[in-house]
Amino acid sequence: MAAKVEPFWIRKTLEHLDQEEWESLCDGCGLCCLQKLEDEDDNSVYYTRIACKLLDLKTCQCTDYPNRRASVPDCIQLTPGQADQFKWLPPTCGYRLVSERNDLPLWHHLVCGDRDAVHHERISQSGRMLSEGSVPEDDWEDYLIFRAG
């Protein structure tokens, strides 16, 4: 009988993933591409419903992923070396889960094989976001959806 092989996200730490494995951890929820506000009093970070100008509001995918940092200089590029800072990511995020040595949820495409499951389970923000160009930045506070961490 063949030994059961654990999935790469269980077997490996983030630092040992190859580029394809790293990119595949993204579940496509779009949450990391929402604009965030920081409370000046306690440094808490809050997610808004306001999406980055490059985010497709339906698919929750970046419309110019390879060049995103040229268009959006403050775009956050996640790397394995930042794992200790992933607490701001949603608790469902594959990067955060693997960095905390947890398994991926059943709806994650690497588990279920369906990239649309994140939308069907309403984990993603598909259909619930606004484009950053449609809301004045001074009004973003009116669109808070949850606190990070």
Curated annotation (Swiss-Prot):
Pfam families: CxxCxxCC (PF03692). Belongs to the UPF0260 family. This is UPF0260 protein PFLU_1520. It comes from Pseudomonas fluorescens (strain SBW25).
